[in-house]
Curated annotation (Swiss-Prot):
GO terms for biological process: gluconeogenesis. Mg(2+) binds at residues 680, 704. SUPFAM superfamilies: Glutathione synthetase ATP-binding domain-like, Phosphoenolpyruvate/pyruvate domain, Phosphohistidine domain. The active site is at residues 421, 751. It holds the Pfam family PEP-utilizers. It comes from Escherichia coli (strain K12). Keywords: ATP-binding, Kinase, Magnesium, Metal-binding, Nucleotide-binding, Transferase. This is Phosphoenolpyruvate synthase.
Length: 792
């Protein structure tokens, strides 16, 4: 790739690959790598060219400006924000005032003429690509400039000059010093690429891994209307999608979760260049905010491209994509190694021990907890108010904020999604962040003490006061063998990918209640009879079901997503999903639920479980749950999902519920379907062999079994000290159940609280020959290791 014997000043993307990072920087080298190697595999990258590091170095050398730059940097205190700002501004002005050498200007002119030959009105993106950028140990997130909708050769030339100057942005100078890079060893390449008309469609960022947990079996995609800069900066709360890779590879529907973002604003082309700007920000019409910015087919298509890119690079990738509004085609406009998870880590578990008044909530970044006094920062001029340990509260951050972000104990923003700047840097620094809160800067007051918790799932909470929390560290690579399986109880799909990274042998209890309560929130009957509801209730439900075609589809679709997330997280290990076990008072608390539920004196012993499923008043609601399970197993192919029936009072009820399941298309044994029964009523143990005729095994619910064996209300504080699963009467019932299952060669596990709380009880169950213990995630490692010690 020589040019008249000297190093070329400009290279086309299709001449480049990853071995050219030192010539054109990580960003441009990666674009070249994809055009050269992945074009035939369905990965589309817009064409373009790059100026080389030689071109940049010659530009600085020939003008002599480099000497002045390095002298000024050597005598600047980088940690003094004022000094840094003054030096940075001076250096950037020197570069902008320096003319290009004629050879470089001509080389850019020739390449530009070729790239715009088919359309003289073509618009371009001009991006920076630093030669040290996108190395896996340094996330230069957004540290240099990007110019969009640049039209005409003169405008491209100006943009390239500004890109060169951006190597000396305050944040870039500060970052290099703190990461140990020598300023003299870093050069800049400008990439000039044809624009994808995503101003007329949507764009976003995707990762070939779950960014929060490091779980590598999903692609995580974010999307919003307009140009991608809004998502990258965190100026909008985007739509989010998770796609399961093994399901995608099997050519099945693979989207396991969709979350609609508010998408309030978008960046589009400015009709005329306003104030020298080629783009403008405008409000998104309400009807577009209320729908997803990608179709399911487009989400799957993007995920396929992400998988191809990850496979080619052999590592998790962070990818920017754009959809062309004219052609509908999806393009990849950037790909770099995903920085945070590439580092390797010790497993840390943060636990909040109490909860206070919630001041704000948004998207949780990471799984940590931080606490301290609030500092509301309205703009960058107030940066120096941040002291170490403060909770930084602001509208949104950009890379200029990095020097102070590392001082914060937590970060809270009004705007942004999980791929915004604040999120990327918070992960890198290991600081909890709650982004996209909407009005945190108004609700949180300077100086008040708060606790910021990201340890409770996808939603992050800001609580009033300093609350008590703890952190456990463990780095367990391989677990010792036991004569039983250690499984997990999981209710919240938001935490599934995180929990799947713990040592485990599947899920012994996945509860539907959390999904119905938190992801749906509406009584199933109120949805089935939507047209009969009061207008006010209809409006409330419409607001909740945005993104779904009908009330019925909202219930089935959300349940499907929740179950699929749990199934995908632990695939191919077994995931036993217990169908809904709400009591009548809990169903009544759902939106629209009051008119459909009986008022019972003791709901714990009332209308629940199997009896509810087969009753005329609930059968068609139960059918919705069955439909969701069928979609997960039959359409998506997640046949590791099994179902469990709670609170089966009589053998006749057992027979009736299994027949009802078959009527709904869930026939025992078909497509490998296993149906497990909760063994949680004394009658279940006393007549265990008869109950087992209808099921593939038992999962012991020790909470209800204890309550019913000892005649205790487990919700009553008055008798709570008598509640103990280790009571001999309870153990006698459990022994009967275990022996009966063993005799018939059927599965028997336990999913009650007992073995998580009492290691001696877990040890007794192991001696009894139980097949599995399903434990709370925070006790899995400890209980597993303790039982292994006993077996020695």
């Amino acid at each position: 790739m020589s040019n008249n014997g000297s190093s070329p000043l400009v290279l086309w993307y299709n001449q480049l690959g990853m071995n050219d990072v030192d010539r054109v920087g990580g960003k441009n080298a990666s674009l070249g790598e994809m055009i050269t190697n992945l074009s035939g595999m369905g990965v589309s990258v817009p064409n373009g060219f790059a100026t080389t590091a030689d071109a940049f170095n010659q530009f600085l050398d020939q003008s002599g400006v480099n000497q002045r730059i390095y002298e000024l940097l050597d005598k600047t205190d980088i940690d003094d924000v004022t000094q840094l700002a003054k030096a940075g501004a001076q250096i950037r002005q020197w570069i902008i005032d320096t003319p290009f050498q004629p050879e470089l200007e001509n080389a850019i002119r020739e390449a530009y003429a070729q790239l715009s030959a088919d359309d003289e009105n073509a618009s371009f993106a001009v991006r920076s690509s630093a030669t040290a950028e996108d190395m896996p140990d340094a996330s230069f997130a957004g540290q240099q400039e990007t110019f969009l909708n640049v039209q005409g050769f003169d405008a491209v030339l100006v943009a390239v000059k500004h890109v060169f100057a951006s190597l000396f942005n305050d944040r870039a100078i500060s970052y290099r010093v703190h990461q140990g890079y020598d300023h003299r060893g870093v050069a800049l390449s400008a990439g000039v690429q044809r624009m994808v008309r995503s101003d007329l469609a949507s764009s976003g960022v995707m990762f070939s891994i779950d960014t929060e947990s490091g779980f590598d079996q999903v692609v995580f995609i974010t999307s919003a209307w307009g140009l991608g800069e809004m998502v990258v900066q965190g100026a909008v709360n985007p739509d989010e999608f998770y796609v399961h890779k093994p399901t995608l590879a099997a050519n099945r529907p693979a989207i396991v979760r969709r979350t609609m973002g508010s998408k309030k604003i978008r960046m589009v082309y400015a009709p005329t260049q306003e104030h020298g700007k080629q783009v403008k920000i405008e409000d998104v019409p309400q009807e577009q905010r209320d729908i997803f910015s990608l179709t399911n087919e487009e989400v799957q298509e993007l995920a396929k491209q992400a998988v191809q890119i990850e496979k080619h690079y052999g590592r998790p990738m962070d990818i920017e994509w754009a959809k062309d509004g004219h052609t509908g085609k999806l393009f990849i406009v950037q790909a770099r190694p995903e920085t945070v998870r590439s580092r390797g880590q010790v497993m840390e578990r943060y636990t909040l021990h109490s909860q206070g008044k919630i001041i704000a909530e948004g998207r949780a970044i990471g799984h940590r907890i931080g606490a301290g006094p609030v500092k509301v920062i309205h703009d960058i001029s107030e940066m120096n108010r941040i002291e170490p340990g403060d909770v930084l509260v602001t509208d949104m951050t950009d890379p200029d904020w990095e020097p102070i972000m590392k001082k914060a104990s937590a970060i809270v923003t009004n705007r942004g999604g999980r791929t915004c700047h604040a999120a990327i840097i918070a992960r890198e620094l290991g600081i909890p962040a709650v982004v996209g809160c909407g009005d945190a800067t108004e609700r949180m007051k300077d100086g008040e003490n708060v606790t910021v918790s990201c340890a409770e799932g996808d939603t992050g909470y800001v609580y009033a006061e300093l609350l008590e929390f703890s952190v456990k560290s463990s780095s367990v690579e391989t677990m010792p063998d036991l004569p039983l399986k250690v499984m997990m109880n999981v209710g919240n799909p938001d935490r599934a990918f995180d929990f799947a990274c713990l040592p485990n042998e599947g899920v012994g209890l996945a509860r539907l209640e959390f999904i119905i309560n938190r992801m749906i929130g509406v009584h199933p009957r109120a949805l089935l009879e939507f047209d009969d509801q009061e207008p006010q209730l209809q409006n409330e439900i419409r607001e909740m079901m945005k993104g779904f075609d009908s009330p019925r589809e909202f219930y089935v679709g959300r349940l499907t997503e929740g179950i699929a997330t749990l199934g995908a997280a632990f695939y191919p290990k077994r995931v036993i999903v217990r169908l809904s076990d709400f009591k009548s008072n809990e169903y009544a608390n759902l939106v629209g639920g009051e008119r459909y539920e009986p008022d019972e004196e003791n709901p714990m012993l009332g209308f629940r479980g199997a009896g509810r499923y087969v009753s005329d008043s609930f059968r068609d609601c139960f059918a919705l749950e069955c439909e969701a399970v069928k979609r997960v197993r039959n359409d998506m192919g997640l046949t590791n999902v099994e179902i469990m029936i709670p609170f089966v009072r009589t053998v006749d009820q057992a027979k009736a519920v299994v027949e009802e399941l078959a009527r709904q298309g869930l026939k025992r044994g078909e497509n490998g379907l296993k149906i497990i029964m909760m063994c949680e009523i004394p009658s279940n143990a006393l007549l265990a062999e008869q109950f087992l005729e209808y099921f593939d095994g038992f999962s012991i619910g020790s909470n209800d079994m204890t309550q019913l064996a000892l005649g205790l209300d487990r919700d009553s504080g008055v008798v709570s000290e008598l509640f103990d699963e280790r009571n001999d009467a309870v153990k006698a019932l459990l022994s009967m159940a275990i022996r009966a299952a063993k005799k018939q060669g059927k599965y028997v596990g336990i999913c009650g609280q007992g073995p998580s709380d009492h290691e001696d009880f877990a040890a007794w169950l192991m001696e009894e020959g139980i097949d599995s213990l399903s434990l709370n995630p925070d006790t899995v490692v400890q209980t597993w290791l303790s039982l292994a010690e006993l077996k020695k």
